[in-house]
Amino acid sequence: MHRSISCRLVMICFAGSLTAFSTAAVANTLCVNPAGSHSCYAKIQLAVNAAAANDVINVAAGTYTEDVVIGKSLSLIGAGAHQSVINAANLANGILLDGLNNPGLHNVTITGFTVENALYEGVLVLNTSGATITANSIVNNDTIGPVFGSGPACNGQPAYETDESGDCGGGLHLLGAVHTTVSGNVLTGNADGILISDDSAESRDNLLIGNVVTDNPAECGIVLASHPPMGSVPPNFAPHYGVDHNTVAENIVSKNGVTVGGAGAGLFSDGEGPGRTSDNIIIRNQLTGNGIPGVALHTHVGPAFGAPADNMSGNQIIGNFIAGNGPDTDDTATPGPTGININSGGGGSPVFGTVITGNVIRDEQIDIAVNTPAEVDAHLNDLYGGAIGVANVCALDSAACTGLINATENFWGCSTGPNTKGCAKTSGSAILFTPWLVKPN
């Protein structure tokens, strides 16, 4: 009896293996080269159109002037970021992963390309899950913008992008994206570097790791921003879908937002309806020389304006090196250059559950600035960066100073603690700082 069962199990496993092999065998490899020679396609889009689900498309070195739209699971593999070039001059995007018009789009890989000169985003990942964007150079996109102030934000941009004024989508935009991995890319010369937003659907569980995001002058290096749902109109914007549970890790983010004012890493809600940017992690990044603080969390609406509060809860800022960034402005202003700014503006949306820990902050006038009617926890940080280690800046924004900053167990630059000779200071009310660390953590 046991032998018979074993034989049957072996046969079932073998049959399953054959089935799996048969399924894998249907995936084909297609090729593209500029000449269309050797049975290859001359255009990337032609190969994409011909591909079946799970096919691999190898793109040879050369320049391809096109706007590639992908609506099926496949792998698009270039010869290297400086070899296979998608030049999207006067075209909307270099690459669009279009899950809005292809519901259920998943498991698309893009690697080994330069994507440049698009009117809007170089790469747009739209309503897609499980995409991998790795080892690309995304440069000099957003050529139609940036546009600020009144009037059309980004002329001709699709209706599903509800609030891209200033960056026209950025170099790489994850819009309604889930479980995306963005790794090892270089983004420079765009309006901003990487944008995650929720205009068309919730954006969650995405990982940005090991990217170099530099010299994107008009907006942030990396920004997680909650925008109104498409179809929602003022004055009664619908609740936003949310930008949640994303991880921004081990990126080099420098010299962004220097012409207009952009953070190294931004956690924002745009002030048009109740937004949600919550439970995200900013960890082990280098955030230096950006136009406004290295990490900036902004909310602009709330009870003080008779409006529902934004949900900016549960964000964590951990183990980053932050140095030489600029001051914040407008309704989230800080008195000078700032490392981290947690700011509800005048709207009074409480920012609950913020954790700031293990960061090293240098060359700032204010290391950590806070304005929110909730408790913010900042522990185990090296606050030797500036004259003020922790500041409660609520009075600067005419907000109610009802929040608490728990800044115990930080190193303030010397063993004798804050507000002593040679140590960083505190500024403002409701700051706890005892006990402190006598040496860096």
Please place each PLM-identified region on the residue numbering.
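Bacterial N-terminal signal peptides
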Residues: V10-F21
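Right-handed parallel beta-helix/beta-solenoid
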Residues: T19-L46, A50, A61, A79, ...
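Acidic glycine-/aspartate-rich tracts in secreted/extracellular proteins
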Residues: S37, D55, G62-T63, G80-H82, ...
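Extracellular beta-strand-rich solenoid/capping regions of secreted or surface-exposed proteins
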Residues: Q45, N49-A52, Y64-I77, V85-G130, ...
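Extracellular beta-strand-rich, repetitive "passenger/adhesive" scaffolds
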Residues: V59, A79-Q83, F113, N136
